[in-house]
């Protein structure tokens, strides 16, 4: 019985160490994901603002075409 306890204890110990290492790597990956998400938000806001400016210019040109009295 004692001879089986040592290998099982060793297996448990090694499994615990590998599990803790995996959790540390997972935690490090999650931090990188937050930075990526922030960068994506910044890029999305830039695209959205450019789209708004484009839409405003197009609507102004349409309004000028209908009204007929705009400066070019």
UniProtKB/Swiss-Prot annotation:
Keywords: Amphibian defense peptide, Antibiotic, Antimicrobial, Cleavage on pair of basic residues, Cytolysis, Disulfide bond, Fungicide, Hemolysis, Secreted, Signal. One of its GO terms (cellular component) is extracellular region. Its main location: secreted. It comes from the Eukaryota. The keyword Acetylation does not apply. Expressed by the skin glands. It is found in: Secreted. One of its GO terms (biological process) is killing of cells of another organism. Residues 23-39 form a propeptide. Antimicrobial peptide active against a variety of Gram-positive and some Gram-negative bacterial strains. Has antifungal activity against a slime mold isolate. Has hemolytic activity against human erythrocytes. This is Palustrin-2CG1. It comes from Amolops chunganensis (Chungan torrent frog).
